[in-house]
A protein has these predicted regions:
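Conserved glycine-rich cofactor-binding loop
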Residues: 13-14
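Conserved glycine-rich Rossmann-like NAD(P)H-binding loop of the short-chain dehydrogenase/reductase
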Residues: 27-43
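Substrate-binding pocket helix/loop in short-chain dehydrogenase/reductase
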Residues: 93-95, 99-107
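Active-site helix of classical SDR
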Residues: 118, 154
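Residue(s) in the substrate-gating loop at a strand-loop-helix junction
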Residues: 138
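Short, small/polar-rich loop/turn modules that mediate ligand/substrate recognition or access, typified
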Residues: 170, 175, 221-224
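C-terminal substrate-recognition "lid" of short-chain dehydrogenase/reductases
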Residues: 205-229
Length: 233
């Protein structure tokens, strides 16, 4: 389905990032796996396929994204799909007690990272005349929760950012959409919430399938969507 396509996956060393990488790789794409350290990438991908790239990048730095993604374009000649998977979560204090460091961390990683990657990738997609961008919001983006103000605000910003980009780019055949996962069934989440009913959580592979749909030609008419994918929660 994705033969001949170049797909960039941020946060590729995480559980969801790996699932998305595998989905597109199995579909025949050349996948560029991005994460913040070579050590993480080496751990996530101990056996590397020469068809793909594995690059260290600081997604919170526009300069770092410019350097790495410009080289990807120079090397491969195109970027057809950008999957902005990287993100973070911190349970914090009440809004009025939340530190600047927490606000900066969550907005830089969850929201500004999308701006930073898009600043390089969108001009390339405009030159190509097509492209697909898929962002990760969250079910929590639709409602504020106590002691999660910075997180929910950063993910709500992803939804609005997705809508704005979709409105700006749809006439140039560039689709921008996002998904809103509930609790993802990852080893880290199981460790953090051992008493929870894990059967209600959504597996990364199912999220990857929805992302794959949004990145496919079947979704050419979908712009600015925020799709809930929250398992049985």
């Amino acid at each position: 389905m994705f033969a001949g396509k170049v797909v960039v996956v941020t946060g590729a060393a995480g559980a969801l990032g790996r699932a998305v990488f595998e989905y597109f790789a199995n579909g025949g794409a050349r996948v560029v796996a991005l994460d913040y350290s070579h050590e993480l990438l080496d751990s996530a991908f101990p056996v590397k396929d020469s068809m793909h790239q594995y690059q260290e990048v600081d997604l919170t730095s526009r300069d770092s994204c410019q350097l790495v993604l410009s080289k990807v374009i120079d090397d491969l000649g195109q970027i057809d799909v950008l999957c902005n998977i990287a993100g973070g979560f911190l349970m914090g204090e009440a809004v009025h007690e939340t530190s600047d460091a927490t606000w900066d961390f969550l907005f830089n990683l969850n929201t500004r990272s999308i701006v930073n990657t898009s600043s390089v990738v969108v001009p390339q997609m405009q030159q190509q005349g097509s492209g697909k961008i898929v962002n990760i919001a969250a079910k929590a983006a639709t409602q504020g929760f106590a002691n999660m103000g910075a997180y929910t605000a950063s993910k709500a910003a992803v939804m609005r950012l997705t809508e704005a980009m979709a409105a700006e780019l749809r006439e140039q055949q560039i689709n921008v959409n996002c998904i809103m996962p509930g609790t993802i069934d990852t080893p880290r989440n199981r460790e953090d919430m051992p008493e929870a009913d894990h059967s209600t959580w959504v597996p990364p592979s199912q999220l990857a399938s929805v992302i794959g749909f949004l990145a496919s030609d079947a979704a050419v008419a979908v712009h600015g969507a925020a799709i809930p994918v929250d398992g049985l929660s």
